[in-house]
Amino acid sequence: MREPESRPRLRFDRNELAGAFGDIGTDLPLIIGMIAASGLNSASVLVMFGLMQFLTAFAYGMPMAVQPLKAVAVIVITQHIAPGVLYGGGFSIGVAMLILTITGGIDWLGRVVPRAVVRGLQLGLGLQLSLLALGNYVQRDGASGYVLAAVSFVIIIALLGNRRFPPALFVIALGVVYAIVLKMNVSDIAGSVGFSLPHVQRLSLSEITSGFVLLAIPQIPLSLGNSILATRQIAEDLFPEKRIGVRKLSLTYAAMNLINPWFGGIPTCHGSGGLVGQYTFGARTGGSLIIYGSLFLTLGIFFATGFQHVVQVFPLPVLGVLLLFEGVGLMQLIRGETGNRYEFFIVLVVGLLANGLSYGYAIALVVGTVLYYLCLLYTSPSPRD
């Protein structure tokens, strides 16, 4: 339904408040996982994530949610990427997206990279995340860990798909209570409040280069599909009067990732799921993003020390169950490719290469694309037919 054109760009009421947290169940597990895996500074991550919500609130005047880049998050969590390489990767993603947008290369990339290859990369990410969750995280903490994992699993199954009561929030709350009660002492809790600001970072050429190969190459094709094209379509469906174009989405995507690395922020993007999540619960303006961003700003500026302590002692079995469902969700995206045996074969090859090799995502992208066009050539009817 078309919304009234007189609607303000920013509004603060109970609907905006209700919609503000429509995607927190997806964001928090990835943020916690990245901080834990790479030892990131909590204040920097939280404050910059909050500020990016503000940026898009003012740029769009609608609930254009900001999310962690999923491919980057999965690779960082599973491979324990160093902070400098993460920042270099985020910066290289910003530069690449800016160049692709200005030159029109983003349209070319969308035509050249087959959907089967993108699905294969998602399969590889899902496999890697699920194997890490089951092999490294769920098995930690002995018997108590298995109990926590089982309870978390039951909660998620019971509430799966429930947007009003996102299961991840209840599972995260369980993990936080467990960490505070059983893993933190009085001095940790007493020192959890303080004033913190983001740390300024320096980026080296080697970090930018490594980040480009490890993180940017697998992320950009996925971003093209979910962060740009899918988000533009959903924005057009929900807010047709806004006339949001691919170019503007690409530019704000690039801007976020050109800013974030210098202040210790994680790479971020626009997410079609985040937009739908906030809209579903009532958000109609950028006010929901101001509310959502304020939560992260408050946590980062005043409670970063406490947040860091909680992340350090957060029960890995609980995090493992959350990441397992993230991985399964990524793998489910290949269902639409099962109708064509050649494309399904490419999906499997790309997924296995991405998961099994060093620099696997870059190799899988190239091999999968070449394989796709060879299959296309092989299956095309000859002129004599």
Identify the residue ranges that each predicted region occupies.
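Helix-loop-helix junctions within the multi-pass membrane cores of secondary transporters/permeases
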Residues: 15-31, 57, 62-122, 243-327
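Conserved small/polar residues in nucleotide/adenosyl-binding loops
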Residues: 378-385
